[in-house]
Amino acid sequence: MKILLVACNAKYIHSNLAVYDLQAYASDYADHIVLKEYTINQQKDDIMRDIYLEHPDVVCVSCYIWNLSFVKELMADLIKILPGADFWAGGPEVSYDAEKFLIENSEFKGVMVGEGEETFKELAGHYVEKNPQNLKNMTGICYRDGDQIIHNGWRQIMDLSSIPFIYKDLSEFKNRIIYYESSRGCPFSCSYCLSSIDKKLRFRDTETVKKELQFFIDNKVPQVKFVDRTFNCKHDHAMAIWKYINEHDNGVTNFHFEISADLLREEELQEMSTMRPGLIQLEIGVQSTNPDTIKAIHRTMDFEKLKGIVDRIHSFGNIHQHLDLIAGLPYEDYDSFRHSFNDVYALKPQQLQLGFLKVLKGSHMMEMCREYGIVYKTQEPYEVLSTKWLDYDHVLKLKTVENMVEVYYNSGQFQNTLEYLEKFFPDVFSIYERLGSFYMEKGYGDVSHTRMRRYEILLEFLEDVPEISMDQVKDQMVYDLYLRENLKSRPGFARDQKPFERQIWDFRKREKVAKNAHVEVFADGTVLLFNYADRDPLTNNAHVTDVTKDVFENLNRD
């Protein structure tokens, strides 16, 4: 008997923690279980061949919002070449409408609904021990029995600490993100999120968590990403883990947490302030700053408190902050979203994620679609097309804003240029709004561009902005360019450095400046030294020193 666990991830760097948990929990049947991971970017024929050559008796596949269509197409063909195999689905994308899924996908024997560890273990036992009566008494499944579809109900939640640690051999996770779960469920009721359905919040034993994190620390894993929905919802749990990783820091490993910033306490902030730059990074969901929207989505957030805490963390200078907004929420029209964007942008996060509402199966938001006039895509990821407050024209405009934010803000490559531009626009949202429109008007939106071409397009756009000094813009761009790297070829818009060649050479020789460092003379006479051997651990920007006095003294002597 061979049972194949299949995961189809969005990217190669991702790994599927869920299927590894299933495999580990069903270790009694380890000799019969094989795990295979693929990506949705692979050719289906290649995956189909690989699965076929395993000659499985049972195929269990995890289904998510990013892979469902891919999985259904793949399994529909696999059943033709593996007619004797049983196919099972599991995961959030099939748990909430299991009967409908089985009616529409006749190749599947059944669906594991909800938490899968105990269910999969029993299911594996059913096949290995060849006991046909097991399915009738097994909770956590919906299955096909002849012409009938039988739903046995959801299983009671399990003890999270009973799941074995899956990371025994890190070689199979090389160059991939390590995911870790220290809690399951969520105490909040955000209407767009499936985590809000699972109110039974539970935690992995803290001492067990420490031992497992030490394994990552000892092995100098580059990054560990916690999948906990609100990591800091229980103060003692979060504080113990943050304190532990701070005290056992190896100087390499980064830990990623999704948190609610307004829940942070002084003790936690004090601990964060002492951390190595880059030890942790925080993802903070703001979603909207419109009070009516926050109330409608059943979200709990004190934005003024959140703002103060984000500012405070920013002042530490050691923690990457990633803030999220969602377009398409109830009561959020275009102008309201502009306001939310400006509010969050002012907090200066390292990343500002502009996402769009996805109407998930089983969520309260799906139940409210008619009342809110929400229209969304038929196929996953079920993304919003329009609402009572936001028409499709404005959704399209926000899509271009999202793209511009990703290219110009989140890349971190235009930071000083963007800050300089703020005073020439009514608000920061207008920068990205107008730049996005410019891209579309010029036909630049559907073309891939080099980093340097992005600078040139920005310059072209700014030529029609009143009162702006193009010379100063160009200097800001040159500054941003050299912050990241010592350019092999200077852009055409950069200031000519030939008049200063001898003075810069003398300065470099006198001060024994490293060969890979760069010295730049700007239009206002400022001379800056970019040291690439000394980089900011958060931004990776070169350390910059003002050497104007040293170079100009040399100029004056000459």
Model-derived features: positions:
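A short, flexible N-terminal coil/short beta segment enriched in small residues
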Residues: M1-Y20
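Glycine-rich beta-alpha loop elements in corrinoid/cobalamin-binding modules
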Residues: K2, A18, Y25-Q156
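Radical SAM enzyme core and accessory elements
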Residues: K2-V6, K44, I51, D57, ...
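Proline-aspartate-enriched helix->loop->beta-strand connector
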Residues: H55-V59, V221, P349-Q350
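Radical SAM [4Fe-4S] cluster-binding motif and immediate context
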Residues: S161-S315, I319
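A structural motif corresponding to the C-terminal lobe/cap of the Radical SAM core domain
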Residues: H235, E247-N250, H256-L263, E267-I431
